[in-house]
Swiss-Prot record:
Any GO BP: mRNA transport
Main location: nucleus
GO MF: DNA binding; RNA binding
Region (Disordered): 1-60, 134-203
Bias (Basic and acidic residues): 47-60
Subcellular location field: Nucleus
GO terms for cellular component: nucleus
Gene3D superfamilies registered for this protein in UniProt: 3.30.70.330
Segments traversing the membrane: none
Name listed for the protein in its UniProt record: RNA annealing protein YRA2
Start and end residues of each RRM domain: 64-138
Biased composition (Basic residues): 139-153, 163-180
Amino acid sequence: MDKAFDEIIGNSHTDSSSNHKVTRYRRRDLRNELGPRLGFAPSDAASRSKDRLYREREEPPLPKRIRISKIPLDVSDYTLDDMIKEFGSPIFSKIFDNKEDRTCIYEFEDPEVLEKIVERYNGHELHNAKIEVEIYQPQRKHSRMNAHNRRKQTAQEQGRGRPGSHYRQRPNRVSKKNKGREKNNTPTSVEALDAELDAYMKG
């Protein structure tokens, strides 16, 4: 009889366990999208950042250019064109006028021309002023934006105060009411106390 009772209990337990469905939950850190930051799965932001870095590495650098600066304002564009004409026709040229001087940018198909221009005109005197000629590597727009964003982020972090604080600490301000209370709470002079004591004694 005991054996039969055990079989009945066992069968009922088996039936209940077979009918019971086990609900599987995702890990909470994955549900809350904390998994990528903990190293369980790649995040979209990290993937985009990596893709951008790969694109920047795959993109070839821009051709080098020549920059002529500290040109007097009274030097005409035709004079500058005549100076460069002997080295060939540039494929890119741009002139910037500032308050004090002018600056020219040139790009040539043959990069060897740049060295010749530097040797020829660096320190050259033009209208009683010495001009400067140098070769530089231009940057792409997204590279300049990334550098600007990094500088901006650094400035914001420095303006927040000490690490761990969300806002910059502000000096304690005393309201007008508190100021009035402070004035009323100031101790009176000895003469005033004596006068009050005399009035009290006479009364």
